[in-house]
Design a protein with these regions (language model features):
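Cysteine-centered iron-sulfur cluster-binding motifs in ferredoxin-type domains/subunits
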Residues: 19-36, 62-82
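Inter-heme linker and motif-flanking segments adjacent to c-type heme-binding CXXCH motifs
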Residues: 59
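Non-ligating segments of multi-cofactor redox enzymes
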Residues: 1-22, 28-32, 40-49, 53-56, ...
Length: 167
């Protein structure tokens, strides 16, 4: 990979915390992270490296920060106090501020099914353990419609309603 044109100070624009430089890519932050099992997986350590290396274009195209479910488990797990959840929020803010037309795929997923992550693998695991199926708003058409109507009143969805039409 050629880093000659990367912005070595990009980290200051996105997440101006010296703690970011302490990340040694151990992966402990994804321990217990529900989004780390998503498709694609949210791997905070990869995002931290991309920020440090100044990979601006790659970060613009990255949708995984939007799959974070805000559980903050990464904050508890990080041995270097990098504050991965704050990094995720800062990256989302930077992406939105630099591209007002950006509609993360997670928003489309939230509209269609009420949550950002597919739970297929979790459901298979639950079945293998003899646990009941989790309730899902997608199986409650009236509630899903109410939820979608509510979301349609938000600017990001109402101004881009073509993305949320029924297929």
């Amino acid at each position: 990979m050629d880093f000659s044109e990367s912005d070595k100070n990009l980290w200051k624009d996105i997440y101006n915390s010296d703690n970011l430089m302490y990340c040694f890519n151990c992966g402990t932050c994804i321990t217990g992270c529900p989004a780390s099992h998503g498709e694609p997986p949210l791997l905070v350590r990869n995002l931290a490296r991309m920020i440090i290396y100044g990979l601006e274009e790659e970060l613009f195209d990255e949708d995984t920060p939007w799959s974070c479910v805000s559980c903050s488990k990464c904050e508890e797990m990080c041995p270097m106090d990098v504050k991965p959840f704050e990094l995720i929020l800062a990256l989302r803010k930077w992406q939105s501020a630099n591209d007002e037309t950006r509609i993360p795929t997670a928003i489309v997923d939230i509209y269609k099914r009420g949550y950002t992550q597919a739970v297929g693998t979790n459901q298979e695991l639950r079945e293998s353990l003899g646990l009941p199926e989790l309730p899902s708003i997608t199986k409650m058409p009236e509630q899903l419609k109410f939820y979608q109507d509510m979301l349609m009143k938000t600017p990001v969805i109402s101004e881009n309603d073509y993305m949320f039409k029924e297929e």
